[in-house]
Amino acid sequence: MVRIKPFRAVRPPKEHASEVASRPYDVLNSAEAKSEATERSLLHIIKPEIDFEPIADEHSQPVYDKAVENFRRWQSEGWLRQDPEEYYYIYAQTMEGRTQYGLAMCCHFEDYLSGAIKKHELTRPDKEEDRMIHVRNQQANIEPVFFAYPDNAEIDAIVADVVKNNAPEYDFTAADGFGHRLWVIRDRKTNDRITEIFAGIPALYVADGHHRTAAAARVGQECRANNPDHTGCEEYCYFLAVTFPAGQLRIIDYNRVVKDLNGLTPAELLEKLKESFTVEDKGTEEYRPAALHNFSMYLEGRWYSLTAKPGMYDDNDPIGVLDVTVLSNLVLDKILDIKDLRTSKRIDFVGGIRGLGELKRRVDSGEMKAAFALYPVSMQQLINIADTGNIMPPKTTWFEPKLRSGVVIHSFDEK
């Protein structure tokens, strides 16, 4: 069972929605944010270092203070307004002809602590602390986390009915070509029914936003400890999530590039790979992995298919069967001596949204020596790992499209 509730979203008026909404804070650097930010962009609130000349340290106190100042200013200017009543919201994203429909809601921090909200990645304390400062200072969840829930026919029917019979509040296409629409569910009975249905759902799954989720839980614990009259119903107990049916989500590949071959020549590397893989030379045309345990390698201007031989992985091990684990064990560790993906300076990671061409570019430029493309993890694999309490290796999942920040915001202000 999970506890959710509708909320009074702080959000832009319709005419400013496309300008206020921005990419999330963690997918662009400060220089990119400064270049992208228009006058009303939420980037001034989630990347406030861009308002300093030169760009300031994003973890400095003046920058944290600027975020609070800007959030207040956006509300006083009318670029962000709070809805008069609590609602759920349908947030639809369209990418390359495929649409996924999520529900914007508030989730209870105690469900994360109890394990009803399940994670699949480790978090870093320094990143948690940074997100905590933002939530604590703003008394709001400015950016949502991205959750998945087991497919539910009744929720699907409710969403379909609202979408069919109501015009969207927002309907815009972002600069990356992805479409974003928002519907407000104003019918109280419908909102009540959504709450009831989710009370019967055994778990939610963190897809993207592990640090924001962990930070929200820590803020909830802090507020609970500091409030002698705590009831568990306070607004600070809840944090903002957009939650999608798992069956609608697609994980795309998250690939690897390496700076050296650990002293091997390309020919020696190929020979060593043949101990664990069936190796096929695919020539100069891009080659994309065709199935689980099939990898693509780009080396010295040529593409290769690497298929792990039987017995090289354990189908009964939810972590060992992952292609990121197979590649790490059989290639990165065993051959290239790259032991820790989190700390090694000899490896970098490239989201599949950039395409195989980005892997080729980085190798051809001389920056990297070889590239490896992986077959994407499935949502069912993610759920299996979360359900068994396991943790995925670093840089395993990449979700697209990303949620736009600023479409809806959750404020702790209950007035």
Residue ranges, per PLM feature:
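Surface-exposed, charge/polar-rich loops and edge strands
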Residues: 1-415
